[in-house]
UniProtKB/Swiss-Prot annotation:
Disruption phenotype: No change in extracellular putrescine levels. This is Probable ABC transporter periplasmic-binding protein SapA. It comes from Escherichia coli (strain K12). SUPFAM superfamilies: Periplasmic binding protein-like II. Keywords: Periplasm, Signal, Transport. One of its GO terms (cellular component) is ATP-binding cassette (ABC) transporter complex, substrate-binding subunit-containing.
Length: 547
C-alpha cells in the first residue's frame, strides 16, 4: 500500500508546478489571430498517457502530442494505420508484426532536438518500458501503467523486438484478439527513444513524463498549473502542417465559468458542456453543438471487499433503491441512455437481452430488512469535477443519497478531489464509489478487464475490489479466439456473471458533447476520445456571415 501511494504521489508531483520555463504571458493574447482556445475541466498529473488511468492527458492532450501505431476511424469504428502503415497477425493471434511509416519526424522543442526520424527503436523503447519490469525505465516516476497493468500486459507480452529499422514484432504468451485495439488507444502513444537516451546521460529520466516529445501535430509550449496549457504547432508534422499555429487549453474555470467564457468569446470550444446547459447552447446563434454516441459508462461501484457489500444479495437490494430514470432526466437531460450492461449499446458485444436491475424501493426495503440491514450507513465517494460520462457527479450522488434514504439507508457523501482520488480509494474506507469509464477502443475487452479483472485491483482501476476467477477465465476465453461469434458468446457469459454478482451498477452511457463558436471549423468529435486539432481552423470574418 505504501509503495502504491508513493508512486501515485510521485506522478502527481511531476506537473504540480510549471512544466517548463516560460515567460509570463496572457493565455489568450492575440489568440484569434493565430489559434483558438479550448476550455475543458481537468488537471494534469503526467504528460505521458501510459502513466495515467484517465484525465486530461488521455482525453485531450495525447492526440496532440503523440501518435500510436494504429488509430480508430471515428465513423466506421475500424482500425486504421497511423505510425504503422500495415500489420500482420500471425500464430493465431500470438504474434503481431508492424511495418512502420517512414519519414515521421519528432517534435523539436526547447528541451530536445531530434537527429533522426521515428523508427523501430522508439516503438521497442515505448513498450519495453511498460512490460519489462527489469527495464531501467520501468520504475521511472513509479512502476504503474494503470491501463496496461489492468490488462496484465506485462505477463502476456513475451517480447517486442526490432526486425529492422521499420519493422517491429510483438510475441505474446497467449493469443489475444483484442491486442490491436489496445495498441490503438492513447495509452499506447509512442515515445522518443533518442530523447530518453539523452535524459539518461543527464540523469534526468523523470523529465520524459514532464516535458513531452512526440510525433503529433502540436507540442508543449507553456504550462501553468490550474490555469492553461499552450500548444505550439509542430511544423514538420508528418500529415502536413496543422492549420492553427497555436492552441490554448484553458483549465481555469468550472462548469458555469466555462460556459460564460464561451458566450463572451473567451473560449472558442467548450468540451463536455453540462447537459443542463444544452438549451442555452442551442438557442444562441453564435454557437454550434456536436453530439456523438460515446464509448463510456457511468457506474456505482460497491466495495465488495468490505462487509456487508461483499454479499451480492446486499448489492442487489441497494440497486433496487436507485431511480435511474430520474438520473436520466435530472443529470443527463436526454443526452444518455440507461445502462443495462457495462458495455454501451454501440459495442458489438452488447447483449440486447441484458437487464441488470429495476427500480423497486419497496422490494429494496423488504430485502434489506430480511438481511438485517435496517439502519445501514454507507460512505459514497464522489469526484468533484464533471466527467465525460457524468456531467454532474455531486448532483448524481445527492439523488442517490435521497433514493437510499427512502429505503432506510443513510448515505454520507465524501467529495474526492483530483489526483489523490485513486490513492484514497486504495485505503478501502469507502463503501460506494461513483465513477465511470471511457475508452478509445471498440473492443469489449477495454471495458471488462480494466474495470473488473482481478489484475485491475492492483492497477487501481477496479474500484469495486472484486475478483472472480471464473469471470477472468471467461475473459481469457474471449481473447483466445479470432472468431467474432465465439467472442460474443464469451462476452454474453461475462455480462451474465456481472448481472448475478453486481460488483458495479451501470447507470448511464452518455453522448459526447462539444460546443464551439460559429467561426471554428474542422473539429472532429470521436466516440473514443478527443481527436487531433490539426485540421481545426477559424473561418475568416469576410468569409462567414456573423449570426
Amino acid at each position: 500500500m505504501r509503495q502504491v501511494l508513493s508512486s501515485l504521489l510521485v506522478i502527481a508531483g511531476l506537473v504540480s508546478g510549471q512544466a517548463i520555463a516560460a515567460p509570463e504571458s496572457p493565455p489568450h493574447a492575440d489568440i484569434r489571430d493565430s489559434g483558438f482556445v479550448y476550455c475543458v475541466s481537468g488537471q494534469v498529473n503526467t504528460f505521458n498517457p501510459s502513466k495515467a488511468s484517465s484525465g486530461l492527458i488521455v482525453d485531450t492532450l495525447a492526440a496532440q502530442f503523440y501518435d500510436r501505431l494504429l488509430d480508430v476511424d471515428p465513423y466506421t469504428y475500424r482500425l486504421m494505420p497511423e505510425l504503422a502503415e500495415s500489420w500482420e497477425v500471425l500464430d493465431n493471434g500470438a504474434t503481431y508484426r508492424f511495418h512502420l511509416r517512414r519519414d515521421v519526424p519528432f517534435q523539436k522543442t526547447d528541451w530536445f532536438t531530434p537527429t533522426r526520424k521515428m523508427n523501430a527503436d522508439d516503438v521497442v523503447f515505448t513498450f519495453q518500458r511498460i512490460f519489462d519490469r527489469n527495464n531501467p525505465w520501468h520504475n521511472v516516476n513509479g512502476s504503474n501503467f494503470p491501463y496496461f497493468d489492468s490488462l496484465q500486459f506485462a505477463d502476456n507480452v513475451k517480447s517486442v523486438r526490432k526486425l529492422d529499422n521499420h519493422t517491429v514484432e510483438f510475441r505474446l504468451a497467449q493469443p489475444d484478439a483484442s491486442f490491436l485495439w489496445h495498441l490503438a488507444t492513447h495509452y499506447a502513444s509512442v515515445m522518443s527513444a533518442e530523447y530518453a537516451r539523452k535524459l539518461e546521460k543527464e540523469d534526468r529520466q523523470e523529465q520524459l513524463d514532464r516535458q513531452p516529445v512526440g510525433t503529433g501535430p502540436y507540442q508543449l509550449s507553456e504550462y501553468r498549473a490550474g490555469q492553461f496549457i499552450r500548444l505550439q504547432r509542430h511544423d514538420d508534422f508528418w500529415r502536413g502542417k496543422p492549420l492553427m499555429p497555436q492552441v490554448v487549453v484553458d483549465l481555469g474555470s468550472g462548469g458555469t465559468g466555462r460556459l460564460s467564457k464561451l458566450l463572451t468569446g473567451e473560449c472558442d470550444v467548450l468540451a463536455w458542456p453540462a447537459a443542463s446547459q444544452l438549451s442555452i447552447l442551442r438557442d444562441d446563434p453564435r454557437l454550434r453543438l456536436t453530439l456523438r454516441p460515446g464509448m463510456n459508462v457511468a457506474y456505482l461501484a460497491f466495495n465488495t471487499a468490505k462487509p456487508p457489500l461483499n454479499n451480492p444479495a446486499v448489492r442487489h437490494a441497494l440497486a433496487l433503491a436507485i431511480n435511474n430514470q430520474r438520473l436520466m432526466q435530472s443529470i443527463y437531460y436526454g443526452t444518455a441512455e440507461t445502462a443495462a450492461s457495462i458495455l454501451p449499446r454501440a459495442s458489438w458485444a452488447y447483449d440486447n437481452e441484458a437487464k441488470i436491475t429495476e427500480y423497486n424501493p419497496a422490494k429494496s426495503r423488504e430485502q434489506l430488512k430480511s438481511l438485517g440491514l435496517e439502519n445501514l450507513t454507507l460512505k459514497l465517494w464522489v469526484p468533484t469535477r464533471s466527467q465525460a460520462w457524468n456531467p454532474s457527479p455531486l448532483k448524481t450522488a445527492e439523488l442517490i443519497q435521497a433514493d437510499m434514504a427512502q429505503v432506510g439507508v443513510k448515505v454520507v457523501i465524501v467529495p474526492v478531489e483530483g489526483r489523490f482520488q485513486e490513492a484514497r480509494l486504495m485505503d478501502m474506507s469507502h463503501d460506494l464509489t461513483l465513477s465511470g469509464w471511457a475508452t478509445d477502443s471498440n473492443d469489449p475487452d477495454s471495458f471488462f478487464r480494466p474495470l473488473l479483472s482481478c489484475a485491475a485491483i492492483h492497477s487501481q482501476t477496479n474500484l469495486a475490489h472484486w475478483c472472480d476467477p471464473k469471470f477472468d477465465s471467461v475473459l481469457r476465453k474471449a481473447l483466445s479466439s479470432q472468431q467474432l461469434a465465439a467472442r460474443i458468446e464469451a462476452y454474453d457469459e461475462a455480462q451474465s456473471i456481472l448481472a448475478q454478482e453486481l460488483p458495479i451498477l451501470p447507470l448511464a452511457s452518455s453522448l459526447r458533447l462539444q460546443a464551439y463558436r460559429y467561426d471554428i471549423k474542422g473539429l472532429v468529435l470521436s466516440p473514443f476520445g478527443n481527436a487531433s486539432f490539426a485540421g481545426v481552423y477559424r473561418e475568416k470574418q469576410d468569409e462567414v456571415k456573423k449570426p
